[in-house]
Every structure is written in structure tokens, then in C-alpha cells.
Regions:
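Active-site SXXK
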Residues: 4-10, 30, 56-84, 169-177, ...
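Acidic helix-start/capping segments at beta-turn-to-alpha-helix junctions
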Residues: 85-92
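Generic C-terminus detector
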Residues: 353-377
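Short, surface-exposed loop or secondary-structure junction motifs
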Residues: 92-322
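Short, conserved catalytic-motif segment at the N-terminal edge
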Residues: 3-57, 77, 93-99, 232, ...
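Short, well-ordered beta-strand elements
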Residues: 36, 338-339, 345-354
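Hydrophobic (often cysteine-bearing) scaffold residues that line and stabilize catalytic clefts
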Residues: 2, 6, 57, 61, ...
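Short clusters of small/polar residues that mark proteolytic maturation junctions
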Residues: 37-39, 83, 229, 352
Length: 377
């Protein structure tokens, strides 16, 4: 292996895209084989990116939530085909907006629809029902209260007909609470974080760790990065634990999780299994119909389908990726990125906190460079 080409590309990111800092890590068979950290977590204080830097993961929370839910699936707590309303009654009688009117939904929302973002839900945190719930709770709402407010709003399409990014994985967090009998955060701590040794994974970073958090910067080509005021709408209430966008952790912590999935659910460092290998294979199988594949049209994910909470490579030609079919993972709003390729026994993680995140520029390039580096001498 020779990672010189990857290093040379990464060196261009600060100058060409204006990134304040980044961290790129590569793992083979669960062991780190490459690491490059450059720039600052706090540019103004000259605090560099380091192994213990904590990143706001935003949507990279989603694969963790889906893994937790699939643990309960493995225990027979639900079937993917079960109507969601069997567990969360607020979703039993859903309506669909059609023009200026509403009609009853033709299909019930299934649990599979939550995993696959095909439930007809939205990402609207400012709907009339959400506003009323926030007033009624004086902004101290729980995960379940947010989900109950979401259920009062009409769906945008009949469940199962389309794909649309939404609060579906936040609903999965409420489902986990209902079927496990544990608060969502406690479930993750007991069944994901502690077994994997993820010591810095939090929905709300403790005060004694705040000095390790990477700031988010507005970035523009050829200009110095500008620090942005931190805002995460998915941490707006101290009682809300967002299964879709709420977690923060170090790249080293996330590597424990990603490498376990790459090894079929087995964590070599702690000798712990968090999922069965057959379940991991199911998670990374494309679940979308032809119609839904047309909806899943994000430019950085051309050639990918969508499984149970993760993108999954279905066409090398369509993506321009040399990776193995079934390579999977996800990314976060501030530019974090996970690539998991069981065929190559490979994990790559990229950490940054920037707006825009330049996903369509950075992610496919570091992916493509990586596979050549594995064979270089």
C-alpha cells in the first residue's frame, strides 16, 4: 500500500476549498493503515485537529440508529413488514396531501418504510403541529413528543411509493424506546457505545469535553474560513434525542462502529458482536424500487441505492467507483463521511465541519484515489 496520492489530494483541500481542517483515516481488517490530520478544530485558538477531536456527526447518526433498531429486529421485537401503528398508535390513521386536500393513506406505514425513507414523512420541524408542540412543552419536548407531532401532519405520498429524506430515523428512535423499554440514549449506551468502547459518543457533549469539539466554518474557495455560530435543530430541546442527526463523537469512536459493520457486526478490539453478519448483509442490500431509485438522485450518490439506513453501491458504471458492489455508509451535513467496503475489508472515514461540505467534490475523489492506493507499492 502507498497512500502518497491520497495525501497529495488532501493537501489541496485547505487552499482550493478553504477548509479549516480535516481528518482522513483508513482501516484494513479493522486496523488503521493511514491517517492524515491537517488544520484546525478551532482556528482562532490555533487548536489543531487531533485524535480526540469531537465532530458533530449530524446524519452519520442514522446508521447507528438503524443498527440499534436491527438489533431489536434480531430479537424478534418486530418485523420489517409490521405496520408502524402497531407500536406507535399515533401513526395508525394517516392522511396524504393531494393538491389542496387531504385523503386517507392507501397503505399503512411499515417499519421498513422508516428504514428506507419511504414513509411519506418530511423533515419539517416548523410545521403547525411542531410549532404547537414546542409551545405546549415550552421547548422541553421529548423524542416521543416530537414524533407524535410529526404524526399529526399529512404525508407527502402514500407509504412505499417514493423515497424522500425525512425524520423517519427519529421515528425509529421512538420505536426503539417503545419496544426496548429503555430511553433511546440509554439503549445506545448499553448496546452500541459500551460494547464497542465508544467513550466519546454523546447526544449532548459533556461540559468537560466541549474544549475538544471542532467548530463549524463557512468555507469559500480561495478565502479564509469563517467560524459559524453553532446551531443544530436536532438538539433544540434538552430532552430530545435525534436518531437522525443528534450524535457527536470522535473519528476513532466512529471507526469502532464502522469497522464492526465491515466485519459483519463483529468488533475485534472488544471481542463483541453487535449484529449478525446476515443482518448486516440485509442492511446493505438495495431496498428501493425503480421509481424510488429515481427519487434518490443526490449527485454524490450516483450509482448507489439505499438499504436499511445506508447508501449501497449497485453500479460501478453509474457511480464511477472502483469499489466493491455493496460498499455502504453515509455522510453528515458538515462533511463527515463513512465508506465501508466488506469486499475489500476496508473502511475510510473523513472528518470535517464546514459549510458547504463539498460532498460532491471531496467524497468521490477520496474514494476513487483510495482503491488505487491499496495496490500501490
Amino acid at each position: 500500500m502507498n497512500f502518497n496520492a491520497l495525501t497529495e489530494y488532501l493537501k489541496t483541500l485547505e487552499g482550493e476549498l478553504g477548509l479549516a481542517g480535516y481528518d482522513c483515516a483508513v482501516y484494513l481488517d479493522g486496523g488503521e493503515v493511514y491517517r492524515r490530520m491537517e488544520g484546525y478544530a478551532d482556528r482562532e485558538a490555533s487548536r489543531p485537529i487531533a485524535h480526540d477531536t469531537i465532530y458533530r456527526m449530524f446524519s452519520m447518526t442514522k446508521p447507528i440508529t438503524c443498527t440499534a433498531a436491527m438489533q431489536l429486529y434480531e430479537r424478534g421485537k418486530f418485523l420489517l413488514t409490521d405496520p408502524l401503528g402497531n407500536y406507535l398508535p399515533e401513526f395508525r390513521e394517516m392522511t396524504v396531501r393531494e393538491g389542496d386536500s387531504l385523503r386517507p393513506a392507501r397503505n399503512p406505514i411499515t417499519i421498513r418504510n422508516l428504514f428506507t425513507m419511504s414513509a411519506g414523512l418530511t423533515y419539517d420541524l416548523d410545521s403547525p403541529s411542531m410549532q404547537a408542540m414546542k409551545r405546549d412543552t415550552a421547548g422541553q419536548y421529548t423524542t416521543r413528543q416530537l414524533v407524535q407531532a410529526l404524526a399529526q401532519e399529512p404525508l407527502t405520498y402514500d407509504p412505499g411509493e417514493h423515497w424522500a429524506y425525512s425524520l423517519a430515523h427519529d421515528v425509529l428512535g421512538a420505536l426503539i424506546e417503545e419496544v426496548s423499554g429503555l430511553p433511546f440514549e440509554e439503549y445506545l449506551q448499553r448496546h452500541i457505545f459500551a460494547p464497542l468502547g465508544m467513550k466519546d459518543a454523546h447526544f449532548f457533549v459533556p461540559e468537560d469535553k466541549l474544549g475538544r469539539v471542532a467548530y463549524r466554518y463557512g468555507c469559500e474557495r480561495g478565502k479564509a474560513p469563517v467560524r459559524e455560530a453553532y446551531e443544530n435543530l436536532y438538539q433544540a430541546s434538552p430532552n430530545y434525542r435525534s436518531g437522525g442527526a443528534g450524535l457527536s463523537c470522535t473519528l476513532d469512536d466512529y471507526a469502532r462502529f464502522a469497522c464492526a459493520l465491515c466485519r459483519g457486526g463483529w468488533c475485534e478490539q472488544t471481542h463483541t458482536r453487535i449484529l449478525g453478519s446476515a443482518t448486516v448483509r440485509l442492511m446493505r442490500e438495495n431496498q428501493l424500487s425503480d421509481v424510488q431509485m429515481r427519487d434518490f438522485n443526490w449527485v454524490q450518490y450516483a450509482g448507489y441505492g439505499y438499504g436499511l439506513g445506508v447508501r449501497t453501491l449497485v453500479s460501478r458504471a453509474g457511480s464511477g467507483s472502483p469499489g466493491g458492489l455493496g460498499e455502504f455508509g453515509w455522510g453528515g451535513a458538515a462533511g463527515t463521511y463513512a465508506l465501508i467496503d466488506p469486499e475489500y475489508r476496508l473502511v475510510m472515514l473523513f472528518g470535517q465541519q464546514s459549510t458547504p461540505a463539498f460532498e460532491h467534490i471531496i467524497q468521490p475523489r477520496i474514494r476513487n484515489i483510495l482503491y488505487r492506493c491499496l495496490e500501490e507499492v
